[in-house]
Amino acid sequence: MRGISSKVTRGLPTQSRLQCVDNTGAKVVQLISVLNTGGTARRYPAGGVGDLIVVTVKKGTPETRRQIFHAVIVRQRRPFRRSDGTWVQFEDNACVIVNERGEVRGSDIKGPVSREAAERWPRIAATAKQIV
């Protein structure tokens, strides 16, 4: 995991539902927790693009349902500003399931991946077909 060049707005609070865009068998996941984030007292934890999160699978194959995994957020609907001044917003909230070291569990990522997530997670950048 590396640092990223821009400060991403945290647009996904806990209990949010995300699309899983890899081929691990999970379709819809629910965000349980955001890892490696220093919180503020009484603030509801939230994650943004490039954050490592803990998810549970809500819809998918019977082998993956009701299991807990680590994942990385690759798209979010909430707009965030890049350091060059452009604003980025995607059509959906999406994540990719990874292991604890940041290696992608699946072999394919559907749809675009944000540049911030690709900078921070080189294994996701290698697997992604389109980086925006």
Put a short name on every predicted segment.
Residues M1-V72:
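Ribosome large-subunit tunnel/peptidyl-transferase-proximal elements
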